[in-house]
Amino acid sequence: PVIAPLVGGQLLLFTTWRVIFIILAVFSAILLLGSLLFRESLPKEKRVTGGLATATKNYFTLIKDKRFLGQSLIQFFAFGAFFAYISGSSFVYQNIFQLSAQEFSYLFGINSCGIILASAISGRVSNVVTSRQILTFSLWQLTIGSLLFLVAMIFEWPLIPVTTILFFTACTVSLFGSASFSMAMTKYGKMAGSASAILGFASMFAAGIVSPIVGLGGEHTGIPMGITMIVCAALSLL
C-alpha cells in the first residue's frame, strides 16, 4: 500500500489502467505459484502440531488475554487511521489540489521514504527507550497529525502545509506498528504464528472498513478522510 501508488503512477505514463490490472493478475498468479512450490524450512521437530484444533485453541487463549487484546485493538484503530490516509490521499492531492497521477505518486513516494526513515530511527533508539514509550509517542503524533489534517481540510489550507502534516502523520505507521507488535508478542513466542495472524487480521480488517467510509463525502472533499483518521487515532490512544 505504500509503494504501489508510486509504481502505479509511473506505469500510467506508458500504459492505461487496464494494463495495471493485467500486471496485478500476473503478480497474483506468480504469488499463487510460489505458495504452491514453497517448502517449509523449519525442522519438523520444531513445528507446532495439532492443526486447526491447536490454532483455534491458541486464538481463544490470545483473545482472552486483555493485554494482547488491547494491542490488537491498537493495531486495528491505528492502522484504520493509516489506511484512511492510504485510501483518501489520492482524492485530496488529485481532486482538491489538482495534481496529476505522477505528481501524486512523487509526494506519496516522499512519504514512503519518511516511513522507511522512521523505521530506521525506531531501530536505533530501541536500546534507549522502551517499546511502550515509542508506541505512546507515535500514537500521540498520529492523533495530533490527524487533527491538524482535519483542520486543514475544513479551512482549506494550501498544499505545502497539508503535505507536511501527512508526511509526519504517515511516518508513525512504522513506529506504532513495530512497537505494538513487539509488546503483543512478548508473552507468546510459542504462539507466534497465531498471534501474528490475529494482529495482521486486525490491521487488514480495519483497512476494509475505513476505505469505503473515506469516500462517502465524494471525491472533492478531504473532510471524511480527516474525520476517519482522527476518530481511529483517538480510539487507539484509549
Regions found by a protein language model. Name each.
Residues 1-38, 106:
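Helix-loop-helix hairpin linking two adjacent transmembrane segments in secondary transporters
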Residues 6-15, 93-94, 125-126, 213-222:
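Interfacial helix-cap and linker-helix signal at transmembrane-aqueous boundaries
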Residues 41-72:
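Juxtamembrane intracellular "pre-TM" segments in multi-pass secondary transporters
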Residues 64-84, 167-171:
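Pair of pore-lining "gating" transmembrane helices in MFS-fold secondary transporters
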Residues 101-109, 196-197, 226:
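Small-residue hotspots at the loop-to-helix junctions and early N-terminal turns
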Residues 118-132:
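Helix-to-loop junctions at the C-terminal end of transmembrane segments
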Residues 133-179:
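C-terminal transmembrane helical hairpin of 12-TM major facilitator-type secondary transporters
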Residues 182-223, 228-229:
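A late C-terminal transmembrane helix in Major Facilitator Superfamily
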